[in-house]
């Protein structure tokens, strides 16, 4: 009997378009001799829409539903995704997707799901909290200042100017895919950057700008996590912003990255240590800065990285000999393994 995968995609965050691309890729890559795929679209308003089911390879004309093509007659209660024995693959990015909220919902439904649990998802989604946890694990971070809504902004800007040097990068703490991130060269630009970042979150991170290569490591596993050789993001723009990342295709990837064996070893070890520090499960992508001074800074952990067939995470594993369809199978198996362990702990 075939295993059912429930594919959740879309979502309420600014990254919903990325989610659709990832879900389409998964839907086309699945081994339909082993799996049946049922898809549910989460609209921008948070409604669940029952969309297509696939028991064999979809045709080129098959497209997943989006906000532009919603059939509201197919709206269902969120709990309608439940199917005994099915595994949920929440291909959701950003807030209300990989921040622990959907993971908590799926645990209430008592369904296995791909990826990190409530704790590790919510922790990794918040950049400030992640930095504090990784600091406690002894992992080097880019110098930063945290600013929370209600803080004296003028005093915080003074702290930034005391501890850091321009240029600095300002980021919403709880957002991904470079949404709301700005580079500032002076105080006036920093004030504008803070205003933008606070539109997306009530907690904001200001980081020291560094001249660095962006190196990424893939992680796969539960308590026996394994890492990939690193890959490098090669950019044609000033920084890896949302448009460059997903719309303009102004980036290329160098896999494996051209760095020394010693640097590779440190990055892989730090990535695995970070994954364990947050209690990660299933998958993550760990992003590093490798500065022109030879410093290695862990930038962030993405618990549901971009998952199209041309995204960095699947390509990193392809370089390690695990194909995209096989990667999906492994993630489903890991989801069932972590579900069984979680259920056993409740007895």
UniProtKB/Swiss-Prot annotation:
Pfam families: Dala_Dala_lig_C (PF07478), Dala_Dala_lig_N (PF01820). InterPro entries: ATP-grasp, ATP_grasp_subdomain_1, D-Ala_lig_Van_CS, D_ala_D_ala, Dala_Dala_lig_C, Dala_Dala_lig_N, PreATP-grasp_dom_sf. Pathway: Cell wall biogenesis; peptidoglycan biosynthesis. Its cofactor is Mg(2+); Mn(2+). It is found in: Cytoplasm. One of its GO terms (cellular component) is cytosol. GO terms for biological process: cell wall organization; peptidoglycan biosynthetic process; regulation of cell shape. Mg(2+) 2 binds at residues 300, 302. It comes from the Bacteria. It catalyses: 2 D-alanine + ATP = D-alanyl-D-alanine + ADP + phosphate + H(+). ATP binds at residues 161-216. Mg(2+) 1 binds at residues 287, 300. Signal peptide: none annotated. One of its GO terms (molecular function) is D-alanine-D-alanine ligase activity. It is an enzyme of class 6 (ligase). Keywords: ATP-binding, Cell shape, Cell wall biogenesis/degradation, Cytoplasm, Ligase, Magnesium, Manganese, Metal-binding, Nucleotide-binding, Peptidoglycan synthesis. Its EC number is 6.3.2.4. Residues 131-333 form the ATP-grasp domain. Binds 2 magnesium or manganese ions per subunit. Cell wall formation. PANTHER family: D-ALANINE--D-ALANINE LIGASE (PTHR23132), D-ALANINE--D-ALANINE LIGASE A (PTHR23132:SF25). Belongs to the D-alanine--D-alanine ligase family. NCBIfam families: D_ala_D_alaTIGR, PRK01966.1-4, PRK01966.1-5. This is D-alanine--D-alanine ligase.
